Regions:
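Class I SAM-dependent methyltransferase SAM/SAH-binding core
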Residues: 50-52, 56-103
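Short alpha-helix
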Residues: 172-195
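Conserved Class I S-adenosyl-L-methionine
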Residues: 191-229
Length: 229
């Protein structure tokens, strides 16, 4: 059996971008997105929002649809930002920037709401990443974060994809709930809500192979955090 190459995020998303739409396109993403949208304020009118690790722009679309006055998307992958340009129609309400979660190219306290969906696992160190998300969010503002649930890697699941007929995996670090709790407590981020969504069997394509265990365990870990100071 040929080993699946494990790529760093920039290399991986350069290959993945051409087939990566601006919506949840697999059962895990749909479960994660339902959890994140349930924790997101319904009315974002007048608010500045930030999508850190915006990819092709799926959460930017949701926030603009909920009335955000201005949305900024940041991503490390030039290919994914190019995809977002094609997918989004935010006009002057949306700005896209190349940058890393380790040094977001935005001013302190810019966002009323910061979203970071399924990205934190691409970085080895959780606390500095949360610190940077907090810096970009105003005091009293919200940070919504999600990641692949640590149960997944423990069961041998990988974040993988196909490009040009070949399968690849994306490098991923495992962050336990205890790591999140400790980092938030140290930084002054209040954990207001935690969700651990399960797969919806209706999202699994007919005839597709799925590990039966995947229907019995959480597939994502999602947090609603508030910057206290």
């Amino acid at each position: 059996m040929t080993a699946v190459p494990v790529l760093d995020p920039v290399e991986a998303y350069a290959l993945w971008a051409p087939s990566y739409p601006a919506h949840a396109h697999n059962p895990v993403m749909r479960a994660e997105e339902r959890a994140m949208l349930a924790m997101m304020p319904d009315d974002l009118r007048g608010q500045a929002v930030l999508d850190a690790g915006c990819g092709s722009g799926r959460y930017l679309r949701h926030m603009l649809a909920r009335g955000a006055a201005h949305a900024t998307g940041v991503d490390l992958s030039p290919a994914m930002l190019q995809r977002a340009v094609r997918e989004l129609d935010g006009g002057d309400r949306c700005t896209l920037r190349l940058g890393s979660l380790e040094a977001l190219p935005v001013p302190d306290g810019q966002a009323d709401l910061t979203v970071c969906g399924l990205v934190v696992g691409h970085l080895e160190r959780l606390r500095p990443t949360l610190d940077e998300l907090m810096r970009a969010t105003r005091p009293g503002g919200l940070v919504l974060c999600s990641d692949v649930h640590p149960i997944g890697p423990a069961l041998g699941w990988r974040r993988d994809f196909k490009a040009a007929g070949r399968r690849y995996a994306v490098r991923h670090a495992q962050h336990l709930y205890s790591h999140w709790h400790a980092a938030c407590a140290a930084l002054g981020l209040a954990i207001e809500e935690v969700r651990e969504p399960l797969l919806d069997p209706a999202d699994i394509p007919s005839g597709a192979y799925f590990d039966p265990v995947a229907l019995a365990v959480p597939v994502a870990l999602a947090f609603r955090l508030r910057r206290l100071h």
